A protein has these predicted regions:
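Short, glycine/charged-enriched secondary-structure capping and boundary segments
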Residues: 124, 130, 175-176, 190-193
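Solvent-exposed, flexible loop/coil residues
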Residues: 45, 77-79, 99, 126, ...
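Generic detector of leucine side chains in alpha-helical contexts
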Residues: 3-6, 30, 39-41, 58, ...
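Generic preference for well-ordered secondary structure
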Residues: 18-21, 25, 39, 51, ...
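Left-handed beta-helix
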Residues: 65, 70-71, 76-79, 84-85, ...
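Terminal amphipathic alpha-helical/low-complexity segments used for targeting or macromolecular assembly
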Residues: 1-66, 182-186, 192-205
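Generic anion/oxyanion-binding catalytic loop in active/binding sites
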Residues: 23, 126, 131, 148
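Conserved catalytic-core motifs of eukaryotic protein kinase domains, centered on the activation segment
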Residues: 119-121, 125-128, 153, 187-188
């Protein structure tokens, strides 16, 4: 069984890989690998360059050199996350990524944000069964501290999720949402002309 087949199996409950007898052990091995890498990430100081290398190993995808993260950080699976360029992830974030998490360029993620791509079946007889849907955060969105984004949500470009929000449905581009559950608060005025470079970190991270 391959990693790509496993990723696809989370996206499609009818995927043939879900019936592969090797799947449970393969999944557990990859999760344990993630625990080891996360312990390495979170236990001692690392330079920004070292964190990029560690996160590339965790995700098994090349993470761009512009990526910045402040530990601690944990992911349930770790192998189904895609980071764009100039992404910043603040301390204490938790990613439940089995269903797939895609984070676009220039995204800012505050302290203690939870991205959860899984949910349990509501039927008591099936309550141990998990269902997965992806989370997509489009370019230049800002996710406020202590917010939670649930499975199947797409956060639009240049949108803002207020601190402490619980997002259960898609967020339109150029909007601010907040509350539990998150609701529309206001529009964001677009003051960036097309093609204008954005000074993401201004040298302070």
């Amino acid at each position: 069984m391959t990693l790509e087949e496993l990723r696809q199996s989370f996206a499609d409950e009818n995927h043939p890989a879900n019936k592969n007898p090797e799947r449970p052990d393969f999944f557990r091995e990859l999760c344990q690998e993630s625990r080891r890498i996360e312990m390495e990430l979170n236990s001692v100081y690392h330079t920004p360059e070292e964190i990029v290398e560690i996160m590339s190993r965790l995700t098994r995808r090349k993470v761009d050199s512009t990526f910045r993260l402040f530990p601690p950080f944990t992911a349930d699976f770790g192998k189904n996350i895609v980071f764009g360029k100039n992404v910043f992830v603040n301390a204490g974030c938790r990613f439940q990524d089995q269903g797939g998490i895609t984070i676009g360029d220039g995204v800012l993620i505050g302290h203690n944000v939870v991205l959860a791509t899984a949910t349990h079946d509501l039927a008591p007889s099936k309550s141990r069964k998990l269902h997965y849907k992806p989370i997509v955060i489009r370019d230049n969105a800002w996710i406020g501290s202590n917010s939670v984004i649930l499975q199947g949500v797409t956060v639009g470009e240049w949108s803002v999720v207020a601190a402490g929000a619980v997002v259960v449905r898609d967020v339109e581009p150029y909007t601010v949402v907040g509350g539990v559950p998150a609701k529309f608060i206001r529009k964001v005025d677009n003051d960036v002309e097309a093609g204008t470079p954005v000074d993401y970190f201004a040298g302070h991270i």
